[in-house]
Regions:
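Conserved catalytic or regulatory cores that recognize and/or transform ribose-phosphate-containing ligands
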Residues: 1-305
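Walker A/P-loop-proximal flanking segment of P-loop NTPase domains
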Residues: 297-382, 387-390
């Protein structure tokens, strides 16, 4: 007889009725499983006197099947789901559809769009679904393997940092973005203002290919209307699962979920946010330098093989490819006009029309001439009006 499949079941402590129902389901699965399955929940881990996050992650490491209940988009459960996906675990998601908003909230949770769930009404219904669908029979059919196998690109585009911006551009968010931009660390930025519907494959690929992640959360009051913190908790779990360095920052007042309380720093002011991030980035720069040296040593003597399946298709946002865009940029009439213009030229166009791509290629081309000194000025949104006002002020030639 084959060894039983180990299942770890993640669920929230509240509301108590939901927690109780799931614990009864765990007991019934163990009783009726005929030795095929051993299921246990987080309350059985025995975390007294231990770091909870280590015990939870160890339990996920040891299981073959990860079951999570997303009736409520609980940040602890979402963090654990991200960790399980990164560790290539078979996932079975459940939803108590008797809760009025459960299905609607799940459908609106864009990062899991396309990932199915088992909808149940009570403990009997859930246990019956478990033995009917038999998720323990195909533990190798994982979300991670399906995403990686269906990816358009198998080239590992290594990045130093994945940065998940705050949904609202608060002063701490503006100052943190400036700090990261000035650090010189190659960064992939997930900006909700640019694109708030990146697919799960994008997050898995970019988290896997980054050394670290900075995740900036809103306080509960400002996140309530358009929830973003749940998705960010999930991505933090992905980053943890890929063994990345993770810094989570949150605007005050923010109640820290137990799972990632050790990764989180709640800031009252912008200065506190920037100070914490700057210290963390200093350590990250040293780590990236060391990893770069290791990679060069590994690559010595290795012949580069070019294959069509390794073709890198690039990012849909030019800001994420400042360093690589110049390698595949196709010159356009607008680009050539900008190089030949006598004094100045203004690009006008909607998002995605190529304004930033042209800017980077123009700067790179002009910078290749040692007679030129190129300076890119990219004001954040709130500074733009000030720049326009400055242009209207009469200044002496020296001041100009």
């Amino acid at each position: 007889m084959a060894d039983p499949v180990i299942c770890f079941i993640a669920y929230p402590a509240n509301p108590p009725a939901l927690s109780e129902m799931l614990e009864k389901s765990i007991a019934r699965i163990n009783t009726e499983g005929d030795g095929l399955v051993i299921a246990r929940g987080w309350k059985e881990l025995g975390v007294t006197g231990k770091l909870i996050i280590r015990e939870v992650c160890a339990a996920i490491d040891d299981c073959q099947l990860f079951i999570c209940d997303l009736t409520y988009l609980n940040p602890n459960v979402l963090f654990e789901l991200g960790y399980a996906i990164a560790h290539d675990k078979r996932v079975w998601i459940t939803l108590d559809i008797t809760y009025e908003d459960s299905k609607q909230n799940y459908d609106k949770f864009s990062i899991l769009r396309g990932v199915g769930y088992a909808g149940y009404k009570n403990s009997d219904h859930l246990v019956n679904l478990f033995f009917q669908q038999r998720p323990y029979d195909n533990t190798r059919e994982t979300i991670y393997s399906q995403l990686i196998n269906s990816s358009n690109s198998t080239r590992e585009q290594r990045n130093g940092l994945l940065y998940l911006k705050s949904r609202i551009e608060t002063q701490p968010s503006i100052d943190l973005s400036r700090l990261i931009r000035n650090s010189g660390i190659q960064t992939i930025t997930d900006d909700p203002d640019e694109n708030n519907s990146q697919p799960l494959a994008w997050y898995v690929q970019n988290t896997k290919n980054s050394e670290a992640a900075i995740i900036h959360l809103l306080d509960e009051n400002r996140d309530a209307r358009n929830p973003q913190n749940g998705k960010y908790s999930f991505v933090a779990g992905l980053a943890m699962g890929f063994n990345n360095s993770v810094l989570m920052l949150a605007h005050s007042k923010y109640y820290s979920p137990i799972d990632y309380s050790d990764l989180l720093y709640v800031h009252e002011t912008s200065d506190e946010c920037v100070f914490k991030a700057s210290k963390w980035l200093e350590a990250l720069e040293g780590h990236i330098l060391m990893e770069g040296k290791k990679l060069k040593e590994q690559m010595r003597g290795v012949e580069t093989k070019i294959a069509l399946r390794n073709l890198y298709l690039g990012e849909d946002i030019a800001e994420n490819e400042e360093y690589d865009l110049v390698d595949y940029f196709i010159e356009t009439a607008s680009f050539k006009d900008a190089l030949n213009v006598s004094q100045s030229m203004i690009y006008i166009g909607r998002k995605g029309s190529g304004k930033t791509a042209n800017l980077y290629k123009i700067a790179h081309t002009l910078g290749g001439d040692h007679r030129n000194h190129v300076c890119l000025i990219k004001p954040v949104g709130y500074e733009l009006e000030g720049v326009l006002r400055l242009l209207q002020v009469k200044l002496s030639r020296a001041e100009q």
